[in-house]
């Protein structure tokens, strides 16, 4: 049997950040990763804002940054004038395009340097509970089953998260309309603008969008995400993306060198994400932005918050629901309002026709985005396209 103050299940950005901060707080910390290699396989567009690195005290390093972009462009179905957002206005997925595998390894190394133990190829097999409190996990490590006892467990086991369900948290179960199926190529020999990440809306990606994340030197991540309510299987999803690439002048002569697929949760903030002795972070806590599908930044922030409350709980020997809810309060304050707004937008956008989407993009592209407001958009739409105001009022 092994004993720790903190057990972190999962070695992604949320888990590594939680482990790093817990270790920095002087807590004996173990992080486990089920795969033999942290950061692999990559299932992500690899976009991240600069601000999150600063907030989490992560020094930008060219070893894990493939490209730095100025902003994002959002195209309507006609692909005429796009909405252009500078990086500071474009959200948590715009600023850097990462080498995600190297980034995840870097974060794990920071956790280890802070004092955390790291075990790879060590999946959690079950939850250990004592008197209603999560008290550790059964782990397969070095071909043995090991009981690891911990005062606090932080579950960062991603979209496929099992640990929370094993412990009895039902909130992490997703409705079908809150699951996106995603497929992405890494492409070479492409001709795309290296200064902007591009997003394409409309029937080319039903109830979702297509993205192009430039990585520099003729390389880009080109992917599609669509609701599983609209796409029946990944072959259909692949056909949509292949059709887009064939018709894109800068992509059609490129070659794909990697194909990755996966699922993404796009729900409102779900509670509870704690119980005595357990907190969920990142994708495991369903903290993916419902409109962008991005989750790296939210995973990092939630990992920081989890470590902060863990420190307080261990120092006071208090693992009550009231203590655990301090973490939930931080999560709600940071994410709840934004995720609700973006969830409503996601649901509404899925129902808009290509013609209406074009009109919306046309209006917003004309606005001065430093002073943009709901009132300004509605007024502009009423003046130019009065027939679609009713259709859009719930969205904006």
From Swiss-Prot:
A 2,3-bis-O-(geranylgeranyl)-sn-glycerol 1-phospholipid binds at residues 338, 374. SUPFAM superfamilies: FAD/NAD(P)-binding domain. Its cofactor is FAD. Disulfide bonds: none annotated. FAD binds at residues 14, 33, 44-45, 47, 100, 124, 162, 283, 295-296. One of its GO terms (molecular function) is flavin adenine dinucleotide binding. It is an enzyme of class 1 (oxidoreductase). GO terms for biological process: glycerophospholipid biosynthetic process; membrane lipid biosynthetic process. Pathway: Membrane lipid metabolism; glycerophospholipid metabolism. Binds 1 FAD per subunit. Its EC number is 1.3.1.101. It is found in: Cell membrane. It catalyses: 2,3-bis-O-(phytanyl)-sn-glycerol 1-phosphate + 8 NADP(+) = 2,3-bis-O-(geranylgeranyl)-sn-glycerol 1-phosphate + 8 NADPH + 8 H(+); 2,3-bis-O-(phytanyl)-sn-glycerol 1-phosphate + 8 NAD(+) = 2,3-bis-O-(geranylgeranyl)-sn-glycerol 1-phosphate + 8 NADH + 8 H(+); a 2,3-bis-O-phytanyl-sn-glycerol 1-phospholipid + 8 A = a 2,3-bis-O-(geranylgeranyl)-sn-glycerol 1-phospholipid + 8 AH2; CDP-2,3-bis-O-(geranylgeranyl)-sn-glycerol + 8 AH2 = CDP-2,3-bis-O-(phytanyl)-sn-glycerol + 8 A. Keywords: Cell membrane, FAD, Flavoprotein, Lipid biosynthesis, Lipid metabolism, Membrane, NAD, NADP, Oxidoreductase, Phospholipid biosynthesis, Phospholipid metabolism. GO terms for cellular component: plasma membrane. InterPro entries: DGGGPL_reductase, DGGPL_reductase, FAD/NAD-bd_sf, FAD/NAD-binding_dom, Geranylgeranyl_Rdtase_fam, Geranylgeranyl_reductase, GGR_cat. Pfam families: GGR_cat, Pyr_redox_2. Its main location: membrane. Is involved in the reduction of 2,3-digeranylgeranylglycerophospholipids (unsaturated archaeols) into 2,3-diphytanylglycerophospholipids (saturated archaeols) in the biosynthesis of archaeal membrane lipids. Catalyzes the formation of archaetidic acid (2,3-di-O-phytanyl-sn-glyceryl phosphate) from 2,3-di-O-geranylgeranylglyceryl phosphate (DGGGP) via the hydrogenation of each double bond of the isoprenoid chains. Can use both NADH and NADPH as electron donors. Reduction reaction proceeds via syn addition of hydrogen for double bonds. Monomer. Belongs to the geranylgeranyl reductase family. DGGGPL reductase subfamily. This is Digeranylgeranylglycerophospholipid reductase.
């Amino acid at each position: 049997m092994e004993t720790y103050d903190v057990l972190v299940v999962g070695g992604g950005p949320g888990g590594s950040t939680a482990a790093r901060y817990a270790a920095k707080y002087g807590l004996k910390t173990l992080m486990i990763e089920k795969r033999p290699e942290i950061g692999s396989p990559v299932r992500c567009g690899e976009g991240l804002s600069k601000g999150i690195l600063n907030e989490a005290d992560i020094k930008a390093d060219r070893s894990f940054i493939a490209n730095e972009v100025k902003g994002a462009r959002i195209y309507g179905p006609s692909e005429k004038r796009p909405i252009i957002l500078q990086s500071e206005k474009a959200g948590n997925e715009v600023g850097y395009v990462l080498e995600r595998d190297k980034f995840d390894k870097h974060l794990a190394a920071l956790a280890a340097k802070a004092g955390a133990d790291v075990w790879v190829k060590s999946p959690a097999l079950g939850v250990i509970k004592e008197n209603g409190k999560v008290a550790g996990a059964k782990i397969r490590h070095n071909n043995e089953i090991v009981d690891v006892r911990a005062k606090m467990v932080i579950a960062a086991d991603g979209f496929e998260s099992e640990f929370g369900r094993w412990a009895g948290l039902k909130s992490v179960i997703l409705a079908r309309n809150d699951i996106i199926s995603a497929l992405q190529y890494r492409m070479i020999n492409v001709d795309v603008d290296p200064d902007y990440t591009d997003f394409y809306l409309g029937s080319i990606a039903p109830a979702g969008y297509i993205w192009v994340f430039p990585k520099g030197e003729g390389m880009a991540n080109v992917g599609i995400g669509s609701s599983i309510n609209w796409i029946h299987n990944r072959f259909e999803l692949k056909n949509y993306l292949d059709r887009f690439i064939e018709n894109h002048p800068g992509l059609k002569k490129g070659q794909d060198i990697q194909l990755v697929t996966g699922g993404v949760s796009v729900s409102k903030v779900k509670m509870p994400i704690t119980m005595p002795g357990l907190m969920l972070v990142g994708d495991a806590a369903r903290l993916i932005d419902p409109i962008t599908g991005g989750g790296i930044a939210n995973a990092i922030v939630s990992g920081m918050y989890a470590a902060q409350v863990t420190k307080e709980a261990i120092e006071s020997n208090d693992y009550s629901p009231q203590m655990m809810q301090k973490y939930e309060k931080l999560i709600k304050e940071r994410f709840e309002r934004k995720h609700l707004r973006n969830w409503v937008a996601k649901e509404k956008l899925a129902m808009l026709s290509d013609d209406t989407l074009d009109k919306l993009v046309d209006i917003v592209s004309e606005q001065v985005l430093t002073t943009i407001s709901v009132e300004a958009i509605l007024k502009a739409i009423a003046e130019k396209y009065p027939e679609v105001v009713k259709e859009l009022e719930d969205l904006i």
